[in-house]
């Protein structure tokens, strides 16, 4: 009888698990991926795609082809819960999938639950497929607009700033009409990065005519505006939510140990302390012994140790500990072919940094392109 490994979500860690099981199959183990989308975006290249520097296939991994080449069964469905006692995952379509060991790498969505009207008005940047459909519509609207569209991005972290600059670059190249505003409830943009990075991006936003509003929490969203904490009404034709990460409700509801925000708690083995048959990585996981920001960099690094521990868990072996790096290099693009590096207190930028970033990103994607065509 085969052991059953179930992978929930096609995130950055899981594509590496699939690749490695394809390169080195495990006798007696049947691997299944459950993910609603055929293509998974590589977050490092997504702003470049928005900006017009990459094609869709340059920055998306075809999960169907990758799974087929690795001997992994792919199920196109979204998991809505787990019966931990029976070891069964339930999907939105009513299907159930049994497992002996399950790994969860299904990502997160922007935090909007506490803002009245946010779910009805505006577009969260995740899930990515829905956002990309919206982006196509927005580009067409900007090309055909008789006057500037008022586009507001809520969130001034690296994701929000990089996305804003990418959209600005593409719409400008389309000869579209748009005025961008970035707003944040905090006192600075790029709060997780050093002052040198903040200064560089503040200058870039100014140079491109993009308005930055700090200390401006959103209290309410309507069809035509955002109401700020000060009571000011900010008119908006389009609102894009790039706020902090939010977890889905089902991990907590099914009985997994989660943190205060609902993310799945994992130990140094990337394993749930409450249920040893469950592993989690990426945004949906909270490594409480070594907290790190929600970033694709860490999800990528978790792929190899996750693969090894899944093999060991299925064999009944001793698990390895994973110790994430204390700080990660961030290469943040400015919409054009220029990027700024942020590492600890260091900050430097240039066209050569963008080429460096492009080299790293395309090399990452090539790993999965080789697997897809094998």
Which residues does each predicted region cover?
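Beta1-alpha1 glycine-rich phosphate/pyrophosphate-binding loop at the start
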Residues: 1-72, 162-193
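Internal hydrophobic alpha-helix adjacent to the cofactor/substrate pocket in enzyme cavities
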Residues: 297-325
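Short hydrophobic core segments
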Residues: 8, 97-109, 127, 218, ...
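Rossmann-like NAD(P)H-binding beta-loop-alpha module
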Residues: 135-181
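FAD-binding core/adjacent interface of flavoenzyme oxidoreductases
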Residues: 2-4, 69-152, 240
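FAD-site-proximal beta/loop scaffold in flavoenzymes
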Residues: 120-147, 233-238, 242-301, 308-309
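A Rossmann-like FAD-binding core segment of flavoenzymes
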Residues: 74-81, 169-268
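C-terminal auxiliary extensions adjacent to catalytic cores
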Residues: 336-374
């Amino acid at each position: 009888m085969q052991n059953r490994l179930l992978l929930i979500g096609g995130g950055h860690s899981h594509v590496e698990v699939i690749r490695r099981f394809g390169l080195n199959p495990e006798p007696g183990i049947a691997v299944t991926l459950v993910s609603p989308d055929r293509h998974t975006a590589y977050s490092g290249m997504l702003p470049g795609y928005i900006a017009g520097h990459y094609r869709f296939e340059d920055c998306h991994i075809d999960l169907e082809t990758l799974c087929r080449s690795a001997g992994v069964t792919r199920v196109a469905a979204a998991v809505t819960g787990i019966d931990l006692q029976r070891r069964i995952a339930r999907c939105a379509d009513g299907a159930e999938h049994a497992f002996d060991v399950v790994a969860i790498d299904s990502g997160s969505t922007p935090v909007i639950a506490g803002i009245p009207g946010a779910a009805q008005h505006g577009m969260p940047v995740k899930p990515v497929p829905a956002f990309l459909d919206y982006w196509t519509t927005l580009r067409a609207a900007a090309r055909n607009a008789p006057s500037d569209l008022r586009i507001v991005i809520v969130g001034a972290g690296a994701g929000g700033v990089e996305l804003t600059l990418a959209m600005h670059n593409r719409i400008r190249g389309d000869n579209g009409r748009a005025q961008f505003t970035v707003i944040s409830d905090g006192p600075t943009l790029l709060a997780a990065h050093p002052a040198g990075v903040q200064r560089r991006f503040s200058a870039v936003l100014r140079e491109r005519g993009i308005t930055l509003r700090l200390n401006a929490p959103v209290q309410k969203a309507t069809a035509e505006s955002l109401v700020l904490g000060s009571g000011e009404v900010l008119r908006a034709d389009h609102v894009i939510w790039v706020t902090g990460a939010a977890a889905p409700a089902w991990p907590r509801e099914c009985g997994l140990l989660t943190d205060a925000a609902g993310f799945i708690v994992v130990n140094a083995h990337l394993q749930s302390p409450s249920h040893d048959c469950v592993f989690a990585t990426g945004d949906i996981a909270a490594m409480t012994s070594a907290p790190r920001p929600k970033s694709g960099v860490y999800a990528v690094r978790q792929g190899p140790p996750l693969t090894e521990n899944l093999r060991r868990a299925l064999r009944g072996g001793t698990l390895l500990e994973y110790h994430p790096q204390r700080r990660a290099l961030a290469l943040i693009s400015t919409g054009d072919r220029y990027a700024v590096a942020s590492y600890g207190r260091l900050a430097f930028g240039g066209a050569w940094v963008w080429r460096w970033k492009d080299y790293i990103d395309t090399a990452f994607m090539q790993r999965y392109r080789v697997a897809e065509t094998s």
